[in-house]
């Protein structure tokens, strides 16, 4: 059985350096540290989590799941001299002005948008270190997001395909029931082409 824990691979470091996106990790670490200072647990989802699981693809923002979005926003933007500020017109997004990285704050227990069926998991660990969402939950969130907007969110499906291949994920990976069939179809299609 493959290891299902994050494994930042050398390719992710090289990619971040070559594309000038190391600031994404810096912004995520700053946010995690501020949240930890106020005993708020977090989980990293999205492209940064995908990188941490071994698929080095470009991402320019950070997605953080927290138990209470309003509390997290207040903590992250409490320092009036920054470097994290709210983004006008986007209630759940902040920007680290040092790196120009956008940080989306996502609600645990809720879904991404209407039509989605997989809720964001509840973070339980308070830490200044990045807490990466478990792989099977990341796969579930990615497939759910893709199913709701298959054209606009096509990268989510690609992330799943790449993670299945790179991590040699099993067909019986325990994903959310709402996306189980989609996972099986994707896994089977990959096997049919190899």
Where do the language-model regions lie?
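Compositionally biased terminal segments of proteins
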Residues: 1-194
